Amino acid sequence: MSGQDKASQRVLCAMSGGVDSSVTAALLKDAGYQVIGAMMRFWPDDKRVDTFDTCCSPDAAYEARRVAEQVGVPFYLLDYREQFQHHIVGPFLSEYAQGRTPNPCVNCNTKVKFDELVKKAKMLGCRYVATGHYVKRVEREDGSVEFHRGDDPRKDQTYFLWGTPREALPFILFPVGELEKPRVREIAAEKGLLTARKPESQNICFVPGKVQDFVAEHLPQRQGLIREIRTGEVVGEHLGTQFYTLGQKKGLGLYQTHRVRHVVHLDPETNTVWVGDYEDCLWTGLKAEGANYLLDLAELPREVEVQVRYRTKPVRATVLHADEHGFELQFEEPQFAVAPGQSAVLYAGTRLLGGGLIADHARNLPVVPADQAAQPVPVSG
């Protein structure tokens, strides 16, 4: 696209007050686009502002506005408090109450950022939405757009974007997707941006400390039993299944601690935490629901790579079944503690194909109700 063409293209740049979105705005401005900076307000009036992490706080909004002034672009603070509470905070707590382990950042990108922001961009007459995600946008000769892993493998964020509506792909830009993080900071320093040395946010933005503390504040305790998955034996007590996640081995509240046990299964209906050995946490496959695909379903390859948690390497898998609602796949090698509620994200090489929410599994060891667990359960395979 020529400079003259870019000058006629308006871009809504999502700004968080961090270095990545700051450099994104600066690069777009340098490239000749008409840039509008915007930050989404998530913090409610009835909450202390320090309960929000640096990427979503009033201080971050102030810094984003100052960066917009440095870059020379207009800046708007957009009110999305209601949507954030409805689509993100509420479901986050609901998932924990149902024994699942949610990833709110995936939900936020899907239902707030790349849904609401694209709508707002169209209202403002913008051709594109841009963010500071480390994702590569690849445009093919036929005009179709693909999302690929960012060039910095340590910062790649495609895992969080599997839910992006396919029709929105052509309207999203990722200017830092082809850069490594140190270079992004260099650019910020060269331009004198005040966020050049700002540390990265590490927490869930609306959880000020530990997730368990946040969950405890909002969900009531329910005392229950911890049982051994193979025998049904009671080996401890707990204060609620919402305080546990699959694979967990510390802080379980077991009567005896000489043997290492992991959380194998959570059953909120009976208020039971099931524990077992490491091998009991191995999954041979998974079922995912709420699927979204960034290509025609007929083009989804049978052999894929799947990533089941952020910052882990993808593993090879075979797609056994896929439709518009979800998919089922088998791992090439069993995987440890695949957690329902997390995302199963599909790739072909560096290309993001789509994903879904992990709903169920195909472990070697079945979960046995307490009234059927008087005898050890034989392990198949």
UniProtKB/Swiss-Prot annotation:
- Specify whether Cytoplasm is a keyword of the entry: yes
List the CDD domains: MnmA_TRMU-like
Q: Which residues form the signal peptide?
A: none
What's a single GO CC term here?
Answer: cytoplasm
Keyword tags: ATP-binding, Cytoplasm, Disulfide bond, Nucleotide-binding, RNA-binding, Transferase, tRNA processing, tRNA-binding
Give the highest taxon in the source lineage: Bacteria
Where is the protein situated, by its record's location annotation? Cytoplasm
Q: Which SUPFAM superfamilies match?
A: Adenine nucleotide alpha hydrolases-like
Which reactions are catalysed by this chain? S-sulfanyl-L-cysteinyl-[protein] + uridine(34) in tRNA + AH2 + ATP = 2-thiouridine(34) in tRNA + L-cysteinyl-[protein] + A + AMP + diphosphate + H(+)
Q: Any idea which positions bind ATP?
A: A14, M15, S16, G17, G18, V19, D20, S21, M40, G132
Gene Ontology molecular function: ATP binding; tRNA binding; tRNA-uridine 2-sulfurtransferase activity
- Tell me the segments the record calls region Interaction with tRNA: 155-157, 309-310
InterPro entries referenced in this protein's UniProt entry, alphabetically: MnmA-like, MnmA-like_C, MnmA-like_central, MnmA-like_central_sf, Rossmann-like_a/b/a_fold
Q: Choose any GO biological process term that the UniProt entry carries and state it.
A: tRNA wobble position uridine thiolation
Give the positions of the site Interaction with tRNA.
Answer: H133, Q342
**Keyword flag NAD:** no
EC number, as in UniProt: 2.8.1.13
Please report any disulfide bonds recorded for this protein chain, giving both cysteine positions: C108-C205
- Annotated active site residues, numbered on this chain, are C108, C205
Pfam families the UniProt entry points to: tRNA_Me_trans, tRNA_Me_trans_C, tRNA_Me_trans_M
| Homology family | Belongs to the MnmA/TRMU family.
The role this protein plays is:
Catalyzes the 2-thiolation of uridine at the wobble position (U34) of tRNA, leading to the formation of s(2)U34.
Protein name (record) = tRNA-specific 2-thiouridylase MnmA
